[in-house]
Amino acid sequence: MKAVIQRVLNASVSVDDKIVSAIQQGYCILLGVGSDDTPEDVTKLSNKILKLKLFDNAEQPWKSTIADIQGEILCVSQFTLHARVNKGAKPDFHRSMKGPEAIELYEQVVKTLGESLGSDKIKKGVFGAMMNVQLVNNGPVTILYDTKE
């Protein structure tokens, strides 16, 4: 699994010009499910997201987790994270998991995060839809994480 984890002041996702989800301070996560991902990757990614200290506390930077600040998460599926562009100009998506299997793992990540933070703290995009994602990146702080590395 690959994730782009962005610390945001706010973020939203729209489909057909209608906002379907929005959050305030927290993370906007673009999540790509790879063809070789398993439930173990769900656990590894979820644990990493929950343990990351990307927020400041009163005394020092990089000391607080998403739970510490009572932040929210907007999790958006993005199969293009596994695209290869080494040969030619057209992206190769063969390393991305197919929709029916990928949605199960994506939903497991959302569920796992919700169980830890509270389901009201987790919002998501529409799996497989063409979406517009808007965000105010705070810092900017953007972390790339791959469960296979």
Swiss-Prot record:
Keyword field: Cytoplasm, Hydrolase, RNA-binding, tRNA-binding
Superkingdom of origin organism: Eukaryota
First-tier enzyme category under EC: hydrolase
Compartment(s): Cytoplasm
Keyword Cytoplasm carried by entry: yes
Pfam families from the UniProt entry: Tyr_Deacylase (PF02580)
UniProt motif Gly-cisPro motif, important for rejection of L-amino acids: location: 139-140
InterPro entries tied to this protein: Daa-tRNA_deacyls_DTD, DTD-like_sf
Family the entry assigns: Belongs to the DTD family.
Oligomeric form and interacting partners: Homodimer.
Written domain comment of the UniProt record: A Gly-cisPro motif from one monomer fits into the active site of the other monomer to allow specific chiral rejection of L-amino acids.
Role, per record: An aminoacyl-tRNA editing enzyme that deacylates mischarged D-aminoacyl-tRNAs. Also deacylates mischarged glycyl-tRNA(Ala), protecting cells against glycine mischarging by AlaRS. Acts via tRNA-based rather than protein-based catalysis; rejects L-amino acids rather than detecting D-amino acids in the active site. By recycling D-aminoacyl-tRNA to D-amino acids and free tRNA molecules, this enzyme counteracts the toxicity associated with the formation of D-aminoacyl-tRNA entities in vivo and helps enforce protein L-homochirality.
Name of this protein: D-aminoacyl-tRNA deacylase
Organism per entry: Schizosaccharomyces pombe (strain 972 / ATCC 24843) (Fission yeast)
